[in-house]
């Protein structure tokens, strides 16, 4: 047995599961992305099994078959449920509450074995989850191929192009991110008047935007992907809340990495940006 295989998962009689071919599950984190994925799968004719820690799990009620709520991140139980329901593939979508990484009492023994030997950041945690899932014969699927229309293109995305000043600021911000991203932090930052005002750490982009708004009354937000992030489940994501927070903090331009950033609820994002006169720009992809 693989050292990360869930030993107490029930044995499934696959002979009686022909109707469950290509059954897909979603490990649903926070945010609207897992909802979008679940809706799309349901539209394609088969509602996914949804496993989530979310307190608002009922939002999946009509687009999950079945919906499994969990109070704590028990990966053993999640794998058992997927195997019990004949799941062959899983999609991991949504934000992971980063604070749980520092509360080991929440995890089951399977995850604790990993936590004791990996870096305590969300990317390492997600990679460990993927390793365990795949060792149990369940493949991890990319969600960007299910929702290709959400992938940010290059160039102007909103109602107006950036000003020369905004472009100088986001080009500078992108050059800074290229330096700090290999250090496993700083997926996003805010630049105002050629100076870095705030850099994202474990608090997340939204909190970083709020922090920047307390320091300056203007600026641009730049968001890019780390080279060690997995394109299947760890793409940077922006959505309506991003624009709302930018508006509250006085930021006037959003620059994201094209092809490696998702814009969730795109039409709403563009409408909010237009109302607040926020420019949105797709930076050239840093794909290797």
Question: Where do the protein language model's features map onto the residues?
Answer:
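Conserved mixed alpha/beta catalytic, RNA-binding, or beta-rich assembly cores of soluble enzyme
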Residues: 41, 123, 139-244
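Feature captures the catalytic cores and cofactor-binding loops of soluble hydro-lyases/lyases
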Residues: 53-85, 103-114, 207-288
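General beta-strand structural signal in soluble alpha/beta enzymes
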Residues: 26-28, 50-51, 90-93, 122, ...
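N-terminal positively charged helical leader segments and presequences
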Residues: 34-67, 88, 98, 109-116, ...
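N-terminal basic/disordered segments at the start of proteins
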Residues: 9-53
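N-terminal glycine-rich phosphate/adenylate-binding segment common to multiple enzyme folds
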Residues: 78-146
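Short coil/turn connectors at secondary-structure junctions
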Residues: 19-23, 44-47, 85-88, 136-138, ...
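Short glycine-rich anion-binding loops that position phosphate/pyrophosphate groups of nucleotides
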Residues: 30, 95-98, 195, 226-227
């Amino acid at each position: 047995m693989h050292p990360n295989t869930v030993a107490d998962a029930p044995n499934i009689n696959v002979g009686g599961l022909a109707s469950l071919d290509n059954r897909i599950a979603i490990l649903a984190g926070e945010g609207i992305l897992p909802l979008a994925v679940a809706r799309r799968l349901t539209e394609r004719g088969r509602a996914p099994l949804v496993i989530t820690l979310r307190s608002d799990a009922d939002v999946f009620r009509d687009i999950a078959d079945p919906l499994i709520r969990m109070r704590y991140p028990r990966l053993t139980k999640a794998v058992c449920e997927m195997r019990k329901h004949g799941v062959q593939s899983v999609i991991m979508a949504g934000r992971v509450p980063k604070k749980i990484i520092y509360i080991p009492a929440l995890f089951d023994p399977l995850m604790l074995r990993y936590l004791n030997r990996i870096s305590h950041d969300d990317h390492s945690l997600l990679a460990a989850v993927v390793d365990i899932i795949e060792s149990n014969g369940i493949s991890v699927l990319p969600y960007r191929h299910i929702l290709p229309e959400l992938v940010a293109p290059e160039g102007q995305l909103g109602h107006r192009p950036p000003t020369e000043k905004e472009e100088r600021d986001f080009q500078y911000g992108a050059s800074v991110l290229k330096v700090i991203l290999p250090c496993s932090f700083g997926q996003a930052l805010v630049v105002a008047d050629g100076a870095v005002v705030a850099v994202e750490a474990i608090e997340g982009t939204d909190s970083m935007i709020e922090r920047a708004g307390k320091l300056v009354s203007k600026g641009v937000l730049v968001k890019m992907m780390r080279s060690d992030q997995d394109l299947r489940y760890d793409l940077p994501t922006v959505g309506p809340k991003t624009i709302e927070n930018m508006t509250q903090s006085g930021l006037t331009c959003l620059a994201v990495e094209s092809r490696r950033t998702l814009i969730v609820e795109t039409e709403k994002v563009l409408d909010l940006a237009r109302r607040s006169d926020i420019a949105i720009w797709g930076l050239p992809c840093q794909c290797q």
